[in-house]
Amino acid sequence: MSLDINQIALHQLIKRDEQNLELVLRDSLLEPTTTVVEMVAELHRVYSAKNKAYGLFSEESELAQALRLQRQGEEDFLAFSRAATGRLRDELAKYPFADGGIVLFCHYRYLAVEYLLVTVLNNLSSMRVNENLDINPTHYLDINHADIVARIDLTEWETNPQSTRYLTFLKGRVGRKVADFFMDFLGASEGLNAKAQNRGLLQAVDDFTAEAQLDKAERQNVRQQVYSYCNEQLQAGEEIELESLSKELSGVSEVSFSEFTAEKGYELEESFPADRSTLRQLTKYAGSGGGLTINFDAMLLGERIFWDPATDTLTIKGTPPNLRDQLQRRTSGGK
């Protein structure tokens, strides 16, 4: 992995009681040892693989102002990180769910792009087996489950300040409040809505195939083409390029897909991040609620699965063997 660490700082927040978060600040930067580089590379890999929200700094953002001064050489990276950790502590203290953790600031370069990664990591206890096959206690940073993470694309921020996607963050698994306090700390608001862009793409694809008067099989083939392209981009960590997708769909209609979306006013960006859960709807129908979970391939609708919108009834012809076996055993009184 072509990742180079410029500067990295580590601090700690310790929750002493319900009211107080103690600040423990390092007096020096971390040395970019092999172990440190491997840790940052793992953070980069894990973060890049997750669905993210996009944002931009507000004009009043204290973090953005401090970062700008640091980038201009008016403040060193350690002082910047120490002051920012203090602001983070102040924001966290407003929320009853606030816990401590290891606060990490890392300025690094990956594939000619400069980033600032900010995260709060849990330092967890575990066990390890040593060379004598004895079991000893150990601690580790829970990188795989980190949900308080933000990354600023410094290259994008400085070369294209009008961008709505230079800042990315995770919304967190424990609810909206995690995103709220972190956005307050960053002094940021949501920017590009990747889910909305992906939903708009799906609607445009359906309308495009309808206007081209394709039959059901042809429509599904187009949806599969779109899914394959988007999934490849997702796996490669690349964005969906509207013009590239349009070339994939050449021959479907006399009008190109990119021309169609522009003429119909779908307001799709020239490129935008792929959203895995939204794109899955291209090839599958899925839903759950009221104790019922249903998931099936889109091509089965109208063939083995039929929906009557008037009665909101779904009819399935031919159940999966394992489900059929369970039903037969239950209805016959078996266990």
Swiss-Prot record:
Q: Name one Pfam family in it.
A: NA37
Assigned keywords, A-Z: Cytoplasm
Identify the GO cellular component terms for this protein.
Answer: bacterial nucleoid; cytoplasm
Where is it localised? Cytoplasm, Nucleoid
Location (main, coarse): cytoplasm
Q: Name one GO molecular function term.
A: single-stranded RNA binding
Is the Ribosomal protein keyword given for this protein? no
Q: Highest taxon of the source?
A: Bacteria
Q: Which InterPro entries match?
A: Nucleoid_associated_NdpA
| NCBIfam families referenced in this protein's UniProt entry, alphabetically | PRK00378.1 (NF001557)
Q: Which family does it belong to?
A: Belongs to the YejK family.
Put simply, this protein is called Nucleoid-associated protein YejK
